[in-house]
Amino acid sequence: MNLKEFLDIKSEEYNNKAFIENDPIQIPHKFKTKEDIEISAFLTATISWGNRKSIINSSKKMMGLLENDPHQFIINHSDKDLKSLLTFVHRTFNGYDFIQFVKSLKNIYCNHGGLEMVFFNNMKDNSLHNSIHQLKNIFFEIEHLKRTRKHVSDPFKGSAAKRINMFLRWMVRNDNNGVDFGLWKSIPTSYLSIPLDVHTGNVARKLGLLSRKQNDAKALIELDKKLRELDPIDPVKYCLLYTS
């Protein structure tokens, strides 16, 4: 059995609905409309560090503070509504960051056509690295707190942008197994990058897919190249790499 055959088998094992039960992706699965799914997914992915139980609990609190109607809250919130978000905290992401995210998302949905269009309009060189870079620029084009900038990664600054790439996988990829949503038909799955972190990097090195020691933007480019050789159409299907 070669590496591709091994990874394909493992991908089928992991990529099923049973995975949802203990994963943060369960949060956007609670919603029905496109905007609610993508907003809840983006916010959940943003705070996805730490153990999964903590991430899920914090994401549920986020959605509760948005009255379980995230798109409507973001578009129609009042200043009084925003004050209620100050109680939120997950690790270093606090209520002030949450308020900034709501304001920035409102700008994106009201003035830029929504999250999908931000990524679609800035695709370049068969990847979404430039789209992620431009997302950060657009996200903080309005008046903002400097402290909140650290919560939106930028591959052009050397980051592997794990959480945004995880969010993009959820939105773009669709293999009919009911895990990822496949909501964004405008973006090819071939442009996706794997969510790279310490665990992913270590597994990739053991499999001979990655030589670079750091888990950064350069490592992601190297890993992208290898995974696209294995599957040019769906390179991020290899769940084994990032399922611990």
Segments the model singles out, each with a brief description of its role:
Residues 67-81, 123, 214-217:
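A Lys/Arg-rich helix-loop hairpin that forms a DNA/phosphate-binding surface
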Residues 49-67, 75-79, 91-106, 200:
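Non-catalytic DNA-binding core/recognition domains of DNA-processing enzymes
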Residues 88-188, 192-199, 222, 232-236:
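Hydrophobic, aromatic-lined core segments that form the binding pocket/scaffold
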Residues 29, 33, 41-52, 88-92, ...:
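Short, charged/polar micro-motifs that form catalytic or ligand-binding hotspots
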Residues 2-30, 83-113, 233-238:
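A cross-kingdom feature marking charged/low-complexity
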Residues 242-243:
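Conserved small/polar residues in nucleotide/adenosyl-binding loops
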